[in-house]
Amino acid sequence: MIPPAGIEPGKNDLFYNESHDAWRQELRKFVSKEIVPFVEEWEEAGEFSRELYKKAGEFGLLGMGYPEKYGGTSEGIDIFHGIVTSEELAQGCGGVAASLLSLNISLPLIMALGTEEQKQKYIPPVIAGDKIACLGVTEPSGGSDVAGIKTKAVRDGNHFVINGSKMFITSGMRADYYVIACRTGGPGTSGISAIVVEKGTPGFSQTPLK
C-alpha cells in the first residue's frame, strides 16, 4: 500500500478543493495497481514497461492540462492538479514519475512555439501514451548552460541539418520525439531554437550511459 500523501483531502483548503481530492484518490488507486507491484522488478531491469505510458494515457494522466482538442483535459485543471499528480506518482516510485512525466518538459515548447500542424501531429499521440516525447538541452561540454549551447542547426531547403550531442535526457533512450535545443542564430539565448527530431531520422543515434 502507498503511505498517506503529505497533503490529505480536506486539509490545506486554501489551495485544494474537492476536484483535487477526487483526482488524488483516483490516481492513488492507479498507482497502487499499475506501479507499486512492479517497482522491484523494474528496478532490477533498469527500466519500466513501455505499456505503462499507454495505461497512463488511457487513465487521463498524461493529458492533464492540455487542450481537449488534442485529447487532453484542461477545463477545471490548475497547477495543484499537477502537484497532486507528482506527489502520488512519487509515492509509488520517484524514477517512474520523472520518466512518465517527461512530456511536461517537452510538449509545452510545442504548445507555445509550434504550428497548429505540429501540435496536431505530436501532442495527441504523446498524451494518449502511444508515443514518448523528451527534451534535449544538456550537452557534454557545458551541462545545462542554455546560453552556451553548441549544438547547431543550419537550414538546408525545407529542413535543418543538426550537428551536436546531448546527454542526461530524461526518457532519452525510449522517446519517439525529441525537442532539441539548437543554436540557429548568434551567441546567447536569443540564438536558440527548439527543433523536433523524430527517432529514426538519418544520422540520429542514442547511446545509453552506463
Language-model-detected regions and their locations in the chain:
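C-terminal helix-coil-helix/basic helical segment that borders enzyme active sites and/or dimer interfaces
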Residues: 36-47
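A short core secondary-structure module
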Residues: 159, 163-207
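Internal helix-loop-helix
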Residues: 58-130, 170-177
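A structural signal for short hydrophobic beta-strand segments in well-ordered beta-sheet cores
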Residues: 151-154
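A short, Trp-centered hydrophobic/proline-enriched beta-strand micro-motif
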Residues: 129-137
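Mature N-terminal segment immediately following signal peptide/propeptide cleavage
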Residues: 17-27, 32, 38
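Intrinsic disorder at enzyme termini
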Residues: 1-22
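Hydrophobic, small-residue-rich alpha-helical packing segments that form membrane-like cores
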Residues: 142-145, 160
